[in-house]
Amino acid sequence: MTEEVIVIAKWDYTAQQDQELDIRKNERLWLLDDSKTWWRVRNAANRTGYVPSNYVERKNSLKKGSLVKNLKDTLGLGKTRRKPSARDASPTPSTDAEYPANGSGADRIYDLNIPAFVKFAYVAEREDELSLVKGSRVTVMEKCSDGWWRGSFNGQIGWFPSNYVLEEADEAAAEAPSFLSLRRGTALSNGQGARVLHVVQTLYPFSSVTEEELSFEKGETMEVIEKPENDPEWWKCKNARGQVGLVPKNYVVVLSDGPALHPAHTPQISYTGPSASGRFAGREWYYGNVTRHQAECALNERGVEGDFLIRDSESSPSDFSVSLKASGRNKHFKVQLVDSVYCIGQRRFHSMDELVEHYKKAPIFTSEHGEKLYLVRALQ
């Protein structure tokens, strides 16, 4: 008979998804599946669900190797097939998954265009899945209530576990501590004597996921003191309070090289207006080669909800981005130019004008709560 494995909760955790389980510090749990970053456990009330593996520790036995692998070796089991759900009705090839499913017909939300931050790396196991790179951004195009979302990254489209990402469009998630936040602002070291590589300003709020990471609010100025070679998507920074930790580099913009200036002398952002050169020169909504940070500043300084601008993509020279003024947080949507067709999410347009006119009448963004955003007018 296979020995039961007991794990002890190291911290409290509140479930964020239907497939997850609330746990309390020092609670005893039975380990059912440890084959993923998230472990499936059972509590004393016989409820089962997934919890972050770094929130629990083993109490007995099987400390080496995977519990699932040991069970498979013992019982000769193969892969467990996920019960059919709405995801299997996707036009893309259906697959089996080893990730939590509700076991019943799942609801789907289509035609989304929501940016999301990748919290954990994920390697696609099937042809219709999407590999995720920690610290990168993906565009969520479709949601299925079985715990899987469909999105795009670097021109690839596929399914991935929803709790591996954090929606940037979710204002509550942006303003509250992230679901894996441990101790905010935990310092790796005091950073004394470290050479300052850059001075950066944060573009968005961020809550630490691990003890090595550094939490911050939008608009903070920090010093970059190290760029780890083994984790190029993250920079080691020191904030104004002397706390040091890792931050996602695409959450900051470089203001200058070298030591920080006095806070009262933070560089000012010059006026940003429509571009007189570039693909759409002369259009009132085309701002050309401006950064996301400059677009944010312009929208915040002069815009009202619904104002928008279109700019050249920073990551792909031939593509574009739509920046939209919204309550709480501004929204940014990537527009890919493929064979003279403008693609935003799953929709395609023959011209940028057609795209703009479409999203003046149809929502460019719809939240899970029914909030709809439109392109109202070009930023003045």
UniProtKB/Swiss-Prot annotation:
Residues 285-379 form the SH2 domain. One of its GO terms (molecular function) is phosphotyrosine residue binding. Keywords: Acetylation, Cytoplasm, Endoplasmic reticulum, Phosphoprotein, Repeat, SH2 domain, SH3 domain, Translation regulation. GO terms for cellular component: cytosol; endoplasmic reticulum; postsynaptic density; synapse; vesicle membrane. Its main location: cytoplasm. InterPro entries: NCK, Nck2_SH2, Nck2_SH3_1, Nck2_SH3_2, Nck2_SH3_3, SH2, SH2_dom_sf, SH3-like_dom_sf. SUPFAM superfamilies: SH2 domain, SH3-domain. It comes from the Eukaryota. The modification Phosphothreonine is found at T92. Residues 2-61, 111-170, 195-257 form the SH3 domain. The modification N-acetylthreonine is found at T2. One of its GO terms (biological process) is lamellipodium assembly. The modification Phosphotyrosine is found at Y110. Residues 78-102 are annotated as: Disordered. The modification Phosphoserine is found at S90, S94. It is found in: Cytoplasm; Endoplasmic reticulum. Gene3D superfamilies: SH2 domain, SH3 Domains. Interacts with DOCK1, LIMS1 and TGFB1I1. Part of a complex containing PPP1R15B, PP1 and NCK2. Interacts with FASLG. Interacts with AXL. Interacts with PAK1, PKN2 and SOS1. Interacts (via SH2 domain) with EGFR. Interacts (via SH2 domain) with DDR1. Interacts with IRS1. PANTHER family: CYTOPLASMIC PROTEIN NCK2, SH2-SH3 ADAPTOR PROTEIN-RELATED. Adapter protein which associates with tyrosine-phosphorylated growth factor receptors or their cellular substrates. Maintains low levels of EIF2S1 phosphorylation by promoting its dephosphorylation by PP1. Plays a role in ELK1-dependent transcriptional activation in response to activated Ras signaling. This is Cytoplasmic protein NCK2. It comes from Mus musculus. The gene is Nck2.
